[in-house]
């Protein structure tokens, strides 16, 4: 009878849930390209890191192999004012503008607007969900578009969520995230 080594078996199990290094590299490269495109079109910048964040399970560091990557891209507040002044569903127009921006980089991928996000579906099965957001001037988070039911704005603060999760991970001897 063989001895059961729970620790080794659990580590193997955890490793089997993770993305390969190649997949992680592809995700990072796509994130940089998406960020660069948004920065070029909205911020007059070529930065691949400014004005964007991983959110959701990938951003919290709790994802197992995932087929969707959620990111928030910050758009200048002047754009919020422009789309908020539309008579009807400026939120939908904002997503259409973001979609058209991303199509400049990803013309051969399926890029579509849906609800609160612009989806980019890649041929390897990984989908990016890009949420455009506007930072509140008081630093209390962001508002983002909801195109449903005629359009509205919702609030979020992903930085607080990620910070709270990281705090709790530290409090649990780094056992919350593996």
Regions found by a protein language model. Give the residues of each.
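Histidine-centered divalent-metal-coordination microenvironment in nucleic-acid enzymes
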Residues: 57-76, 117-133
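Short, low-complexity, polar/charged sequence segments that are solvent-exposed and flexible
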Residues: 71-74, 90-93, 139, 148-151
């Amino acid at each position: 009878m063989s001895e059961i080594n729970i620790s080794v078996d659990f580590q193997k199990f955890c490793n089997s849930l993770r993305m390969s290094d190649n997949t992680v590299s592809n995700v990072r490269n796509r994130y940089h390209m998406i960020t660069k495109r948004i920065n070029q079109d909205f911020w007059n910048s070529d930065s691949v890191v400014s004005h964007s964040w991983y959110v959701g399970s990938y951003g919290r560091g709790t994802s197992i192999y995932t087929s969707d990557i959620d990111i928030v891209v910050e758009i200048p507040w002047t754009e919020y004012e422009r789309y908020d002044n539309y008579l009807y569903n400026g939120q939908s127009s904002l997503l259409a503008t973001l979609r058209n921006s991303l199509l400049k980089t990803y013309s051969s991928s399926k890029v579509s607007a849906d609800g609160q996000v612009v989806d980019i579906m890649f041929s390897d099965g990984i989908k990016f969900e890009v949420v455009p957001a506007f930072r509140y001037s008081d630093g209390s988070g962001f508002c983002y578009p909801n195109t449903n039911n005629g359009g509205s704005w919702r609030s979020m603060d992903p930085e607080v969520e990620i910070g709270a999760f990281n705090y709790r991970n530290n409090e649990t001897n780094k056992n919350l995230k593996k």
